[in-house]
Amino acid sequence: MASPDWGYDDKNGPEQWSKLYPIANGNNQSPVDIKTSEAKHDTSLKPISVSYNPATAKEIINVGHSFHVNFEDNDNRSVLKGGPFSDSYRLFQFHFHWGSSNEYGSEHTVDGVKYSSELHIVHWNSAKYSSLAEAVSKADGLAVIGVLMKVGEANPKLQKVLDALHAIKTKGKRAPFTNFDPSTLLPSSLDFWTYSGSLTHPPLYESVTWIICKESISVSSEQLAQFRSLLSNVEGDNPVPSQRNNRPTQPLKGRTVRASF
């Protein structure tokens, strides 16, 4: 979904996206600030259930503004169920967002508090649609688990991902990334907030049901520095580190955030 007409600096960053993607000013944009006192506890929300088969992990790719870990998604070996969903959603990829300092980097915030980074695990509705490409623009097409990451202790669960970054230093590089279960990155509690929102970068489709975990996971300052050392340029060009790739929070515009707890 990356294209060269947008990015995260002053010239092509989030403040400019609406010129090319008017939906940037839509009514269901993400991320948002979760105000805990206004979130509505909803007893109808079921527990989140993830079942990921490590054999579906496929490859890691430098997409310029970030990196993606992609999964085989031609069957239901790796799925998300439960929560607000009646359908089953198939795992497609995960990626991270970060900032130029440890003070900020997450996209979602909680009561105005910014975290250092944020993990997004992306799934598409395989009960209703035949591919991610078909699902990505549909209102019930995508389900993304967001996990806030707080700077502190090094997180050993991230090590396999970080060790793979040297192989994809520049934009467009890809490398095999196999035998990995992203549920190992989830916090111990799967209490969550949920709301209807969007992709957080262009094309900004309002097609995402967000599951934001209440509990954060840890990441060390050194691990965050490894994210930032990824280069957004193609090989041979002047090195341009990916310093930040997070969109500021967007207005709720009347949407309700529900809590499972």
Swiss-Prot record:
Binding site for Zn(2+): H95, H97, H120
Pfam families referenced in this protein's UniProt entry, alphabetically: Carb_anhydrase (PF00194)
Keyword set, alphabetical order: Acetylation, Cytoplasm, Lyase, Metal-binding, Zinc
Active-site residue list: H65
Compartment annotation: Cytoplasm
Compositional bias (Polar residues): 240-249
Domain Alpha-carbonic anhydrase: 4-261
Chief place of localization: cytoplasm
Enzyme type, top EC level: lyase
Enzyme Commission no: 4.2.1.1, 4.2.1.69
GO molecular function ontology, one term from the record: cyanamide hydratase activity
GO CC, one annotated term: cytoplasm
Residues annotated to bind substrate: T200, H201
Cofactors (names): Zn(2+)
Positions of post-translational N-acetylalanine modification: A2
Family, as annotated: Belongs to the alpha-carbonic anhydrase family.
Protein purpose: Catalyzes the reversible hydration of carbon dioxide. Can hydrate cyanamide to urea.
Protein name: Carbonic anhydrase 1
Organism: Macaca nemestrina
Gene it is expressed from: CA1
